[in-house]
Amino acid sequence: MSIAIGTDIVEIARIAEVLERQGERFTDRILSPSEKLQYQNHSDGIAFVAKRFAAKEAIAKALGTGIGHGVSFQDMVIGNDEKGAPFAELSNGAAEVMQARGGKKMLISLADERHYAMAYAVLT
């Protein structure tokens, strides 16, 4: 049973501009240590960061909090299973909010095209 949904879309060029201006300050705020390692080794790092940013924003919307209201970017890790399907691991404030809302799992879908990255999150 679905409890809530969230979606987000981001212009990849906007993420590129932020990375140009802020560099590691931005990636340190958005990415977990494991995600940062993947980013550093990824062939398209800008799209990688854009998808993680969109995913975490979508998750925060599904939680009903947004970022900064007891939920931070660091409370969420986006990974891929052995077949490449994305998954989300929630901890700290994000996990607490999920449990308080009666959720057991956060399902996500990610997509990117030349100019945009988008994410869809479903709290179940």
Predicted features, each with a name:
Residues 1-124:
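Core catalytic alpha/beta fold that binds nucleotide/phospho-ligands
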